[in-house]
């Protein structure tokens, strides 16, 4: 039996849930301080290696490329600036020709990192998402297809259609009661009882919908206060974020698309990634977030995928 049989996590069980629900401000602060401390040396070492490789014209490609195919979500998470109640961006869907241009460029680069068709949205609001993941996987067999979803639109039919092309699926089950959404519960039961999917890496994360997390550079609805710090951030060295109109944003924390590092409609992924705008950003961030206007008050901490990639490169 595979170790990948569908998993559920609550981040600390009932005690963790109680603390996040009733003392969310404190748990957020404690978590962030701990994570910054744990990551500081790791990030410095990776940035040093990244810059060495770049100087030798052998720059690391992004470990995570995120493509937002539609800029809408159907959830109301209080910590997210792109939730259904707070969304301020004009509605946009990515043109298919632009998507295929992106995939063609990644194919030419022999891309083998993570590809995620999601940024600040719900992927299954785009009815093309199953076909686009299939196309991406067929064109980029070495890439690891990553999918984040809240699961509310993920039926058995859509799951069966998309899962052959997904390497890692994370279902963020947002709730107030520490229970699974009815749709997610149905999916959990289906996968649990269908052996052909037991070798798939699927995790359901049971998350408190009103939890205080990070300020996302001041745009998180329930945590707008900025936390001025001089911590470095690794995301300019690991992430490449593309919005539906082709704009390359700084990172997923830029949920209102204030930053622009280039546009894939008239530039290539590689030219943007290795270009002067990105290089100037990295030089500033490598010396602390306070050196870049958008980042100086941000307290966002990266997820585990980046850490795994960094540790592999530093071996």
Residue ranges and their predicted role:
Residues 2-168, 181, 305-311, 315:
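Conserved alpha-helical substructure of the radical SAM core
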Residues 2-6, 10-13, 188-222, 253-303:
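C-terminal accessory region of radical SAM enzymes
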Residues 73, 77-80, 233, 251-252, ...:
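Short cysteine clusters
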